[in-house]
Regions:
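Feature marks short, surface-exposed loop/turn motifs that line or immediately flank catalytic pockets
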Residues: 24, 39, 70-72
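Polytopic alpha-helical membrane proteins, predominantly small-molecule transporters/carriers
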Residues: 36-38, 50, 64-69, 90
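The serine-hydrolase catalytic nucleophile loop
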Residues: 42-53
Length: 133
């Protein structure tokens, strides 16, 4: 498995930082984007996204997990984040993932409640949303 520290600039010029976990295979792979909740981090509650990313890589599936603006290692302060900011950050993360050479865009899966509204402005061939309610 390969673990990469990644970052990119969102549409507001802030740096979002995250972690990509890839299987040892070459070429494009099915890919999951994990999005944490309002006050979370890219590791998830009790490191659930870390554990899930490793389990997915063992099955040949890559994944990315980012800290939203104002959370974790990304730019900004928590008190400056907003739901609109979460929405646009999610869109920017989806767009970033779709441009990566290792992502099979046909098999890009978004996992988060916020994703249910954020993906509408990003064009994907296939999208599955998991909602825990």
């Amino acid at each position: 498995m390969k673990i990469l520290q990644v970052q990119f600039q969102n549409r507001n010029g802030h740096t979002l930082r995250g972690i990509v976990t890839l299987p040892d295979t070459e070429g494009k792979v099915p890919f999951v984007v994990h999005l944490h909740g309002f006050a979370g981090s890219c590791s998830g509650y009790k490191s659930m996204y870390t554990h899930l990313s490793r389990a997915l890589a063992a099955q040949g599936i890559g994944s990315a997990r980012f800290d939203f603006y104002g959370n974790g290692e990304s730019d900004g302060e928590f008190e400056d984040m907003s739901f609109d900011g979460l929405h646009t950050d999610a869109q920017d993360i989806f767009a970033w993932a779709a441009q990566q050479p290792y992502v099979d865009i046909v098999k890009l899966i978004i996992e988060a409640a916020i994703a249910s509204t954020a993906f509408f402005n990003v064009k994907f061939l296939s999208l599955i949303i998991k909602y825990k309610g």
